[in-house]
UniProtKB/Swiss-Prot annotation:
Family per record: Belongs to the universal ribosomal protein uL10 family.
Full protein name: Large ribosomal subunit protein uL10
InterPro entries associated with the record: Ribosomal_uL10 (IPR001790), Ribosomal_uL10-like_sf (IPR043141), Ribosomal_uL10_bac (IPR022973), Ribosomal_uL10_bac_type (IPR047865), Ribosomal_uL10_CS_bac (IPR002363)
Native organism taxonomy: Bacteria, Pseudomonadati, Pseudomonadota, Gammaproteobacteria, Enterobacterales
GO molecular function, one term: structural constituent of ribosome
SUPFAM superfamilies: Ribosomal protein L10-like
PANTHER family according to UniProt: 39S RIBOSOMAL PROTEIN L10, MITOCHONDRIAL
Subunit comment: Part of the ribosomal stalk of the 50S ribosomal subunit. The N-terminus interacts with L11 and the large rRNA to form the base of the stalk. The C-terminus forms an elongated spine to which L12 dimers bind in a sequential fashion forming a multimeric L10(L12)X complex.
Amino acid sequence: MALNLQDKQAIVAEVSEVAKGALSAVVADSRGVTVDKMTELRKAGREAGVYMRVVRNTLLRRVVEGTPFECLKDTFVGPTLIAYSMEHPGAAARLFKEFAKANAKFEVKAAAFEGELIPASQIDRLATLPTYEEAIARLMATMKEASAGKLVRTLAAVRDAKEAA
């Protein structure tokens, strides 16, 4: 489908606006994946706060110019599906990783987080980032565990002191 200049400018403006507020971006190749599967992926993405769009590579290069996602430029080869995580940095990576397990033809190319290019082989680094709630829960568990251990050591020291006296 041919796009006129206004359509191209509108696409670049829309995706650029999304990129400004995004926490991370993941690029994938969806050749060979059925429309039904892609519809399921898009639905799951909307629920997870992930903006997804298939955009021409030349337009994507304009979109990422001057953003933390500029490191992705070299991955814009062939059909490109880009996903921006809007609420949690690992949301798009987690979504694409799970989808790729079930769909062999879906290939994650790379991701970008805080200006760093993350190759597809290391996408787990981004996908396994804990959510804010998970991080708080882990921190609280660690703090609780540390204070309980300290209490046990203190009680043991008191007991030892009484036995020595």
